[in-house]
């Protein structure tokens, strides 16, 4: 069993950092601000799914297969990511892209993550169907990676690699492990 299969993540209530924690933990202490965060309840049965409301951060439960969920607390209509309605999840080797909700830097993150922290401005962007992009295959037979093709042509741009380093977490054997994601920002000419 891989370490990634035994970990979950949440956003710290004190400093908004993305925290990784071992599955089954009831509380997680943030290494940066020392806030103790309660872990949300375990995932619902297969016929039900859950999503965090983008408006008020309340956990919402809904019937699997729904395309949107309306929050009864703040009345926000939340789009359900396509992968939330599937029983089988995308392989952990897939990555997806999203623009930072604050500085618009393009960030890459593991497919299925609920949020991404930007290394440039430290903003935590929640991932949902309306702002995430299709997962990119990380490996092709010749060992190279390529984004999916598009029908529109874009002018040449310069790219800059951005490293997103989340707070360290503890693996199943009690050792501290780093959580790093690579992002790409473009400076269009």
From Swiss-Prot:
It comes from the Eukaryota. Residues 9-39, 50-80, 97-127 are annotated as: LSD1-type zinc-finger. Disruption phenotype: No visible phenotype under normal growth condition, however cold treatment induces the development of yellowish leaves with necrosis, and treatment with salicylic acid or infection with avirulent pathogen causes a runaway cell death and plant death. Keywords: Apoptosis, Cytoplasm, Hypersensitive response, Nucleus, Plant defense. InterPro entries: LSD1-like, Znf_LSD1. Negative regulator of reactive oxygen-induced cell death, cold stress-induced cell death, pathogen-induced hypersensitive response (HR), basal disease resistance. May be involved in the induction of the copper/zinc superoxide dismutase CSD1 and CSD2 that detoxify accumulating superoxide before the reactive oxygen species (ROS) can trigger a cell death cascade. LSD1 and LOL1 have antagonistic effects on CSD1 and CSD2 accumulation to regulate oxidative stress-induced cell death. Residues 147-159 have a biased composition (Low complexity). This is Protein LSD1. When expressed in Arabidopsis, Pisum sativa LSD1 interacts with importin alpha via the LSD1-type zinc finger motifs, suggesting that the nuclear import of LSD1 may rely on the interaction between its zinc finger motifs and importin alpha. Transmembrane segments: none annotated. It holds the Pfam family zf-LSD1. It comes from Arabidopsis thaliana (Mouse-ear cress). The gene is LSD1. Induction: By methyl viologen. Expressed in cotyledons, roots, rosette leaves, stems, inflorescences and flowers. Interacts with BZIP10 and AMC1 (via N-terminus). Binds to BZIP63. Interacts with CAT1, CAT2 and CAT3 in a zinc-finger-dependent manner. Interacts (via N-terminus) with GILP. One of its GO terms (cellular component) is nucleus. It is found in: Cytoplasm; Nucleus. Residues 136-159 are annotated as: Disordered. One of its GO terms (biological process) is plant-type hypersensitive response.
């Amino acid at each position: 069993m891989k370490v990634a299969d035994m970990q979950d993540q949440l956003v710290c209530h004190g400093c908004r950092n993305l925290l990784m924690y071992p599955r089954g933990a009831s509380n997680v202490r943030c290494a940066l601000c020392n806030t103790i965060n309660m872990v949300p309840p375990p995932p619902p049965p297969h016929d039900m799914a859950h999503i965090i409301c983008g408006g008020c951060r309340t956990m919402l439960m809904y019937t699997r297969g729904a395309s949107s969920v309306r929050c009864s607390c703040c009345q926000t209509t939340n789009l359900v990511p396509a992968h939330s309605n599937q029983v089988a999840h995308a392989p952990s080797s897939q990555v997806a892209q999203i623009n930072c909700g604050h500085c618009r830097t393009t960030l890459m993150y593991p497919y299925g993550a609920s949020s991404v922290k930007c290394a440039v401005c430290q903003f935590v962007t929640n991932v949902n169907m309306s702002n995430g992009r299709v997962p990119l295959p990380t490996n092709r037979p010749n060992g190279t990676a390529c984004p999916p093709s598009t029908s529109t042509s874009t002018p040449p741009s310069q790219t800059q690699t951005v490293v997103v380093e989340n707070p360290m977490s503890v693996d199943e054997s009690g050792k501290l492990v780093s959580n790093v994601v690579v992002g790409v920002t473009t400076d269009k000419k």
